[in-house]
Amino acid sequence: MSFDGKNPFKILRQTWNPGGWEKETLSGNRTLKHDDAQMLGLDCDGSGRDVYLAAPRKGAWVWIFNQSDAAENLSVKQADGSTALATINQNESGLFYCDADAADDSASGWKLMALITIALG
């Protein structure tokens, strides 16, 4: 194969994620949807809350930050509520990834990728 002078690699440009961050004060438990921001800063507002992930969709991900001002926890669960995946304490965040969807006959394709301590400023 001869070299034709064209670069065989395409260098990707920076990817922007408009609407990718959302901060919310919860008044009760929260069920996520696929049109929610992928990065969510949630304040429990005085009481621990349950967060139900969106219906499984292969390749979906969400990063949830517990931005509560006191020791209040977020319990993150599968979309069908069957399994708790993580408890995110104050000043922690959880990164979740979905590797299955309804086509795979899965109601619980979400996985915890990382539980990360954060510093809020």
Regions of interest found by a model, annotated:
Residues 37, 89-93:
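Tight coil/turn sites that cap or link beta-strands
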Residues 96:
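Cytosolic nucleotide-binding catalytic cores of signal-transduction proteins
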Residues 1-76, 104-121:
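Exposed extracellular interaction/assembly regions and N-terminal maturation sites
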Residues 78-85:
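Short edge-strand/loop segments of extracellular domains
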